[in-house]
Amino acid sequence: MIRVAISGAAGRMGRSLIQAACQYEGITLGAASEYPDSHLIGSDAGEVARVGALQIPLVDDLGKNKEAFDLLIDFTRPEVSMANLVLCRDQGKAMVVGTTGFTKEQRQEITRAAIEIPIVLAPNMSVGVNLCLKLLEMAASVLKDDVDIEIIEAHHRHKVDSPSGTALRMGEVVAETLGRNLDQCAIYGRQGLRSERPRESIGFSSLRAGDIVGEHTVIFAAEGERIEISHKASSRMTFALGAMRASQWVSDKPPGLYDMQDVLGLLKKVN
């Protein structure tokens, strides 16, 4: 049985992760944390997630319960994830990280930590989204430079980073397949008068509204036809169950930096 700790356990995603851990075979909840000033510190994690009492209190520092878990699942914010990274590296514990919005320097620090511990880092742990990434690779390899490419994403009004980590990963997959550098070809939003759209550019548009869980569409537009590859999530449980699958997969892996393509066995390149 794999004992997982969940950081940010009282948040929307954290509660879904607790629910998923309680129903996923081979996984059990060992510890749960919330930010230090939360009024829920000390509350039963199961009651917070509405799955019934689990006798696991929310703590403000997982270091206090380091013997209670084997692996940490983190869907929080970059600064919290980086603090948890230090804890897991020092304790030799695996991590599954779904946090987005990391800086280049923070990603480099995660890469260095992966020399010592196994880490699954993925902006989206939905099986469907990761299948879409493979479809995007296939589409880009066939369509090449003969199409205009736009990525549109929508999330709830509380999401703080934009574009989403998933949208950026989709852009990276397309750019890498086409031999482009996303940092050089990405255009984030458009306003006012501009020159004609450069063919090599990849456009991003973001919507933030209501309670949208997550929607992503990549458009390949040519003269006379348009291909759209879309994914729409209706529940956070799709991400939570993906995180459980990643946790089970990485639990016996050697140190290294992995993503959901590794977890799902989708790394074989499209010809």
UniProtKB/Swiss-Prot annotation:
Q: What does this protein do?
A: Catalyzes the conversion of 4-hydroxy-tetrahydrodipicolinate (HTPA) to tetrahydrodipicolinate.
Q: What class of enzyme is it?
A: oxidoreductase
Reactions performed catalytically: (S)-2,3,4,5-tetrahydrodipicolinate + NAD(+) + H2O = (2S,4S)-4-hydroxy-2,3,4,5-tetrahydrodipicolinate + NADH + H(+); (S)-2,3,4,5-tetrahydrodipicolinate + NADP(+) + H2O = (2S,4S)-4-hydroxy-2,3,4,5-tetrahydrodipicolinate + NADPH + H(+)
Q: Where does it live in the cell?
A: Cytoplasm
- According to its record, what are the GO cellular component terms? cytosol
Q: What is this protein called?
A: 4-hydroxy-tetrahydrodipicolinate reductase
Q: Where does (S)-2,3,4,5-tetrahydrodipicolinate bind?
A: 156, 165-166
Q: Which family does it belong to?
A: Belongs to the DapB family.
Annotated binding of NAD(+), by residue = 8-13, 34, 98-100, 122-125
The alphabetized list of GO BP terms reads: diaminopimelate biosynthetic process; lysine biosynthetic process via diaminopimelate
Keywords, in A-Z order: Amino-acid biosynthesis, Cytoplasm, Diaminopimelate biosynthesis, Lysine biosynthesis, NAD, NADP, Oxidoreductase
Q: Does the keyword Cytoplasm apply?
A: yes
